[in-house]
Amino acid sequence: MFASIKDILKNPILNSNVTINGWIRTKRSNGKIGFIEINDGSTLKGIQAVINEEENQFSEKDLKKLTTGTSISLTGLLVESPAKGQNYEIKTHSFNVIGETDPETYPLQKKRHSFEFLREIPHLRIRTNTFGAIARVRNKISYKIHEYFQKNGFFYINTPIITSNDGEGAGEMFRVSTLKFNKLNNALSNIDFKDDFFGKEAFLSVTGQLHGEAYAMALSKIYTFGPTFRAENSNTTRHASEFWMIEPEMAFYKLNDNIALAEDLLKYLLSSILNECSQDMDFLENYIEKGLIKKLENVINSNFEVITYTKAIEILENSKKNFEIKPYWGIDLQTDHERYLTEETFKKPVVVIDYPKNFKAFYMKANKDNKTVKGMDILVPKIGEIIGGSEREDDLQKLENRIKELNLNIEHLNWYLDLRRFGSAPHSGFGLGLERLVQYSTGISNIRDSIPFPRTPKNLYF
C-alpha cells in the first residue's frame, strides 16, 4: 500500500518503510549516491529519495532510467534529512520505473520556463510547481464555494449548457448546429432552423442565471456552478471564451442583501485559501506576485466601500489622472477607472451601484429615475471588477417594456416572463467568474493560466 507524499510529510513515522508513487522532478548525483526529488502533486514540495548504489544492488540499466519526468514507484526508509530546506527524506531500498521519459525530448527541464512557452503545452505545464500550486488553489476555491453555499441553506442546481436564450442580450454566443456546412454558408436569415437538431436556433449558454431564477422562485436560495461561453473576440489577459461561473439567485433579497452576500462569500473564499493552502500561497508570493498575501488580507479585513456610479464618475472626472478613455456619465467603467477607484481613491474594494441602464442587461430592476438600474459591481485592487450582479426586475409590465425596448425576442423569453406572471417576488443574484478569482488569488497576470485548457480566440489546443 502506498501513501501520498502530503500524508507522509504531515504525519511522518520515522524509521518506517514507506512506498510512494510519483514523477521525478530533479536528479543529481554525488559519486555512488544519487538524489531524486519525487512529486505526486498532493503537495507543492516533493520528497527527496537517496539512492546509495553501494548499499543496494541497483542495475546500471535501471539507474539510467531515472530521468526528469519519469514515473516511479519507490520504497524505502523514512528518515530525518541532514540537508537544508527539508525535514525528511527516503533511503531507497527498491524502485520500479513505471513510465520512462526521454530527457532529450521532454520539454520540461530544471529551469524556469516562460508562461508563453508553457501555454503551448497545457497538457504538461501542470507538472511545474507554478501550475501545480494554481491547480490546488483552484481546487480549494471550488470546494469552498460549495461548502459556503451548502452551509448557508442554498440548493445547488444544474442549468442547461445548450439554450435558445441569450441571457445577457449581448448576442456574443456560440451557435450549436448539426446542419451541413454548405447550408450554413448561406446567409443565416435564409436558414430554416426547423431542420436543425432542436428545431430552432441553439447556442452555448452565456449564463445560468435565467434558469436559476426559475428555481429560486420555488427553493428561495439556489446557486449554479458550471461552464459558460462567450464568443467575444477579445484577446486580453482578462477574457476567455470558456470559463466557469458561480451564480447564486435569492428570492426576497434586495440589492443591499445581494451586496452583503457577495462580500461575505469573497472574504470566505480568500480566507480559506490563505488558511488551507499556505504552502502554495507562500510559493506564489515569492515567485509570482510580491505582496500577494497582503493584497488578499486587505480584501478580507476591509469594509467594502459602496458608491453610486454617478459618484464614481464624479471622482474620476475630478482626478488629475490621464485615463486612456475619458470618463463621463453614460460610459461603462474601464479597467483603469476601476483600478483608480480601488487603488488610489479608497485603497480597498469598492462596490459601484446604480449604473445607467443603457449598457446593463434587460433583467436589471429599474430605479425610480428610470435612467439607472439596481446593478452592482464589486471592484478589487489590481484587476477591477470581480463580481457583477443586480436586483432583478420583478414587475411584469416593466420587464416586458424593457425587452421590447431592446428589441429582444419576447417569444423566446415568454417562459421567463411567467416567473413574473405567477407569484412574482423580489429577487437578486450575481455572477463570480472562477478564473478571474483564481487569477486574482494566485497573482498570475493572464487568465489563460488560471484554467487547465484555455479557450480563447484562435486558440483551441486539444
UniProtKB/Swiss-Prot annotation:
GO biological process: asparaginyl-tRNA aminoacylation
Chief location category: cytoplasm
Keywords: Aminoacyl-tRNA synthetase, ATP-binding, Cytoplasm, Ligase, Nucleotide-binding, Protein biosynthesis
GO MF annotations, alphabetized: asparagine-tRNA ligase activity; ATP binding; nucleic acid binding
CDD domains reported in the protein's UniProt record: AsxRS_core, EcAsnRS_like_N
Enzyme class: ligase
EC number: 6.1.1.22
Disulfide feature: none
Localization: Cytoplasm
Catalytic activity, reaction form: tRNA(Asn) + L-asparagine + ATP = L-asparaginyl-tRNA(Asn) + AMP + diphosphate + H(+)
Pfam family, one: tRNA-synt_2
Entry superkingdom: Bacteria
GO cellular component terms given for this protein: cytosol
Keyword Nucleotide-binding: yes
Subunit-level organization: Homodimer.
Family the entry assigns: Belongs to the class-II aminoacyl-tRNA synthetase family.
Protein name, entry field: Asparagine--tRNA ligase
Species assigned in the record: Borreliella burgdorferi (strain ATCC 35210 / DSM 4680 / CIP 102532 / B31) (Borrelia burgdorferi)
